[in-house]
C-alpha cells in the first residue's frame, strides 16, 4: 500500500527522484513478486523430458520444447498478465478475489451470473492454497537436490535438510520478515543475473538453440508427437507457476515497477536460462539428470546450490505471505470465519501473520515432502492449481472488459478466445496428471471451496433469520427514550452486524439488567468491495438523542477493523474522550442450531455450526480488552 503511494507521488517529483523511486520499487518487486516464477528453471525442463513422457532427446525435440517454453512465457506472462490482466485493478489492488469483486460491481448480486462469478472467484482463491502447499515443497526440495550433483555422498541428507529449512521458515513467520525482507530484492537480482549468465555461457557454445524462437519448432513438435506432446504441455506450464503473483501483488508495488522488472530483467533472464539448458542438452543429452545445476562449472556447483536454496526460500516466503493476505481478504469479505490476524510491522500495513494458516500450511507441506520424497515425484502435482486459476482469471477479466470498461464485445471475444485456448490447453494437459499427484491440489481446493461456500451460505441464512426476527432500531430507540430504563454512568458499545436492527445483546441487557448506559454507541463494521477506504470516508455517525449514537465504520477488504481508531475518530467528531478500560463492550454470542428448516442440508448445517463455534472470538479479532466485554448468548436456528 505504502509503496503504491510512493510510486504515485513519484510522478510529481523531479525526474531523478522519480527514476530512483521506480528503480527501488522494481528491485523490491523482484524480491517478492518473481520468486516463484524465477525458481521454475530448477525443475521445468527436467520434468518436460521426464522418461514417463517418452520424448526422445533429439535436437528437434529439444528445439520444440524450448520453443514451447519461450512462447508460453511470451503469451501468458508478457502479453496476457502484464498487458491485459494487470489493467483490471480494483483501486490498485490485484488478485483473484479483488478481480471477482470488481467483476461483480456492475451486476445484480441476486442473479445467477453473479452467483456463478462469485463461485468462480472463490474457487480460484481456494486453488491458490492448493498451489501454496506445493510451491515451498517443490522449490526448496529441488534446490537442496543440487547436493546430489555437487556432493553425491550427501544425497541422503536432501530430505532432512529440506524439512529443517521449511520448519525454520515457518517458525520465523510470527516475528515478521521486514528485517530480512530488505535483502530479498538484491538477492533475487543476483539470482536472475546468475541464471542468465549460466544460460549465455552455453548459448554461445551452441548458438543454434536460438532457432527455437521460431514458433515453427513448437508447432512441428506438437504435430510430430501429438498425444505425447500434449502431455508435455502439462510440464511446460511449470515455467508459468507464479505468473498469477504478478497480478496478485500489484497492490504492493504498482503495475509499472512490476512491468519494468519483468521486461527488463526477469523475462530475459528466464529465457536465456531455458535456452542455455536446451543448448546443454543438445551438447550432452545425459545432462537431463539435472540440466539446471549442470549448467554450472564444477567449481560453481556448491555456490549455485546455496544461492538456489536462498532463492527458493524467498519464493516460498512470497507464497506464504500471499496466503496470509488472501485469508485476511476472505475474512473481511465474509467467505472465511474470523481468525486471529497479527500485524508484524508498525510501518508496513501488509505485513501480517495468521497463526492458524501458518501451522496448517506447515503441517500439509511436511506431509507432502515426506510423502512424495523428491521434486520429480511432486512435479506431477504441480500445475493444475496454477492453470485452473489462470482460466478463472481470464473469465473474470473478460467480464470486467465488457461490463466495467465497456470494450467492444467482438474485440473482447477475439482476445479472450486466444487466452482461453492457451489456458484451457494447459489445464487439460494437467488434468492428465490427476492420478500421478494432481489430485492433491484439486482435493485441497475442492475441500476449501466446500468449506468457504458452506460458511458464506450459512452466514447468509443467519442474517436472514436475524433480520426476520429483528426489531427496527430507530423506532425502538425513540420508544426507549420516551420510557427510559434506569440510566447508569459510563459508556457502552454494542457491536452489531446490522445498523438497522436492534442488537440482540441490547435486548438481553435490558431484559436481565434493566439498565441503559448514559452514553451508548451502536457500532457496525462494513466491508466494501474495494481494497482500501479513505480515512475521510471511513466513518459516519448520527446522534439518536439522549446519549445514543449510531456509528458505521467502513473498511476495504485489505484492511483490518480497528475499534480503538474508530472510537478516537468518533470522539474527535463529537468532542468526547474514550478509555478502552473504562468502556463496556456488549456482544451477542450466537449459538447456531442445525434444524430441518429450508436453507442447507442438515449435515452442511452441522459443518457450519462447527466452523461458527471455532471462529476467533470478536474480542481477539477486534483487539478488545477481554475484561471489558460482556457476551450475551443467543440461539439461532438455521
Swiss-Prot record:
GO terms for cellular component: plasma membrane. InterPro entries: K+_transporter (IPR003855), K_trans_C (IPR053952), K_trans_N (IPR053951), Kup (IPR023051). One of its GO terms (molecular function) is potassium ion transmembrane transporter activity. Keywords: Cell inner membrane, Cell membrane, Ion transport, Membrane, Potassium, Potassium transport, Symport, Transmembrane, Transmembrane helix, Transport. The chain crosses the membrane at residues 25-45, 65-85, 114-134, 152-172, 184-204, 226-246, 262-282, 291-311, 352-372, 382-402, 410-430, 434-454. It is a multi-pass membrane protein. It is found in: Cell inner membrane. Pfam families: K_trans (PF02705), K_trans_C (PF22776). It comes from the Bacteria. Transport of potassium into the cell. Likely operates as a K(+):H(+) symporter. Belongs to the HAK/KUP transporter (TC 2.A.72) family. This is Probable potassium transport system protein Kup.
